[in-house]
Amino acid sequence: MTGKNVLIICSDEHSRSALGCYGNSIVQTPALDKLAGKGMRFSRAYTPSPICVSARASLATGTHVHENQCWSSSQPFHGQHDSWMRRLRDHDHATVSVGKLHYRSGNDDNGFSEEILPMYLANDGKGWPHGLI
């Protein structure tokens, strides 16, 4: 494959103040710091919604919550709107999602050529570490 790679890391409940590349001297984030040193960092980034599913749907589609209709975590994104992932995939780029997105279903066209789900989602709840918290 030729061309540039794009890596988007989306983290719930994560503040830039918890990263070494933004000046935190206690929290050690060497891999993210290295990526930030070679890539792009934002000094003013805001979430379109305090609800994780709504924010992910807005990030995926470039639309506001009132446009994508994902008002809460009980109304998951199901790929009904155009997304940057779908556009890249449809132009022969591999688009891979790793982790939980809480989209409605893996059967929906979410725009990813591959989705790697956490064990507790991929195995109908088997493997979820219930006793650890």
Name these PLM-found stretches:
Residues M1-I133:
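Formylglycine-dependent sulfatase
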